[in-house]
Amino acid sequence: MDVAKKLVVSKNQLIEWRRHFHKYPELSFQEEKTSQFVFDILREIPCLEVSRPTKYSVMARLIGKQPGKTIAVRADMDALPIHEENEFDFISTYPGVMHACGHDGHIAILLGVVHKLVEAREKIKGEIRFLFQHAEENFPGGAEEMVAAGVMEGVDYIIGAHLWASLEVGKVGVIYGPAMAAPDVFKIIIEGKGGHAGIPHETVDSIAIGTQVVSQLQQIVSRLTNPLDSLVVSVTQFHAGTTHNVIPEQAEIEGTVRSLRHELREETEKRIEQIVKHVTEAYGAKYTFSYEYGYRPVVNDYKVTEIIEQTALQLYGRERVTRLQPTMAGEDFSAFLQKAPGTFFFIGAGNKEKGIIYPHHHPRFTIDEDALPIGVQVFVSSIMNFISKGE
């Protein structure tokens, strides 16, 4: 605990790092300068073994002087293809690319964690493994690549976190069990028979059939799924036609499915295709259907989550620690959880008084930078608690 509470002196450094990453964002699988910046910082820190497990990721290992468990800590580094509309002096210098999800803060936090734990290395037992991950935002994701490169070999526990705009700055949120959804994608192509819009009876109207499909898909959640199961089926694209007087031969529908159980993903895939099949057959059309499985759901381990929660309670008290409901957003942190138990918690970063009110992936998204030292405190103190408990 003593180590973490000294952090206030380096808050300015955390902010400086975060603003640097915010000014120079890079998209998924393009994090060349970001990863090099991180690598160069870590390489200057004594006692670290620093490597590049994949082209755009960085790993650092801090080996304790006594045996113990191996704890991994992860931060993601990629930005989004969004044109920033903020007006502060460190906005993105790259048009159409922006840190609109807080990953700039995640990198800064983990760099702070590295520095604080290196200062406390005499107390470290086992190994702390720091994972700076590329490409969280873009499936198939960087986590799978890092796992394939062996970064989770020998890891006993893994911890990750997200700066969270809907949670007030100063608060820490935890979720026991299923925490974040599996984000799957489906695509439907309806093949009808095109023709004159004024003579519709001679056509097989792909638009009319497509609207029936979209309407019927809403029944999956409302009538075919247990209300106690969390499921989202959202149509997000519908493309058909090029002019006002032609009924198009083809309509394309795309959307996403979000769920917290793998079994429910499989059931939903089958139900979507059943609906498409029956509707198109009824109107004499044909179809093609594809379903792409995204990241697995993030399911937090009870014991690891409890240590994070108890640590946050020790630091801040009950009024600043909350148990959140699962979110239907997706996260490839789940790839790491396939290899070791762990937890993914949330660091409050919103502040209505400062106008920090915009949601993730919004062109005016930002974070309250007061959240940065809080994130470092929770990570560092939790790791020290793991070590002291012999977990």
Predicted regions and their residues:
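Divalent metal-coordination and catalytic microenvironments
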Residues: F21, A60, V73, H103, ...
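Structural motif
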Residues: K69-A72, I128-R129, D156-I159, T211, ...
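Non-cysteine beta-strand/loop elements that form the S-adenosyl-L-methionine
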Residues: A72-R74, H83, F186, F344-A349
